[in-house]
């Protein structure tokens, strides 16, 4: 099975960019936006059913004044248009963003995962990148294994498979 998807920057458009005449954007003040800066109209692609999944890169902490993780997560929940939604997380920022205290606290990732998992439209989680999972900054990999992924994940039914669940290979070891 092959799926077509993208992992776009978190912000499609800012609602605050009123000069652009777009009220469909998010309550953010991002300097870089998918549509206006990267010429990536992921909303159009989802509306037209051209993607099997979307995994937006929500690489911001909860409460960040420019792009608040919780607000942008809610925006993607509302604006995924039935496209399978996975959320990408910034493991690489843990203990590497001294300007922002949130990233020096491993519970920041816990807060984000709790928020993402509370939304039925979110069908999975992505972590960038495996390099940082191996480095296990502040024990974040242990936290993920011990508190979030202590049992094999349930695979969601996929529309591309007629809403059937894909085959899971149980030979893989979580350690």
What are these regions (language model features)?
Residues 1-38, 83-94:
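Aromatic-lined carbohydrate-recognition surfaces of secreted/lumenal glycan-active proteins
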Residues 74-78:
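Short, surface-exposed basic-aromatic patches at helix termini and helix-loop junctions that form
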Residues 39-65, 80-171:
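Substrate-binding cleft of secreted/luminal carbohydrate-active enzymes
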Residues 174-175:
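C-terminal accessory/binding modules appended to enzymatic or scaffolding proteins
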Residues 65-73:
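Active-site-adjacent beta->alpha loops and helix N-cap segments on the catalytic face
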């Amino acid at each position: 099975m092959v799926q077509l998807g993208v992992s776009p920057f978190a912000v499609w458009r800012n609602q605050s960019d009123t000069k652009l005449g777009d009220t469909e954007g998010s309550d953010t003040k991002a300097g870089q936006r998918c549509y206006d800066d990267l010429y990536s109209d992921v909303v159009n692609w989802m509306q037209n059913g051209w993607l099997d999944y979307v995994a937006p890169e929500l690489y911001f902490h909860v409460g960040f004044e420019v792009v608040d993780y919780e607000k942008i997560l809610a925006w993607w929940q509302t604006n995924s248009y039935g496209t399978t939604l996975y959320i990408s997380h910034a493991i690489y920022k843990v203990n590497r963003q001294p300007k922002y205290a949130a990233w020096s606290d491993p519970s920041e990732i816990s807060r984000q995962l709790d928020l993402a998992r509370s939304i039925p439209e979110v069908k999975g989680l992505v972590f960038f990148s495996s390099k940082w999972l191996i480095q296990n900054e502040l024990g974040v990999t242990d936290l993920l294994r011990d508190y979030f992924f202590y049992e094999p994940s349930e695979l969601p039914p996929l529309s591309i498979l007629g809403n059937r669940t894909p085959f899971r290979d149980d030979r893989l070891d979580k350690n």
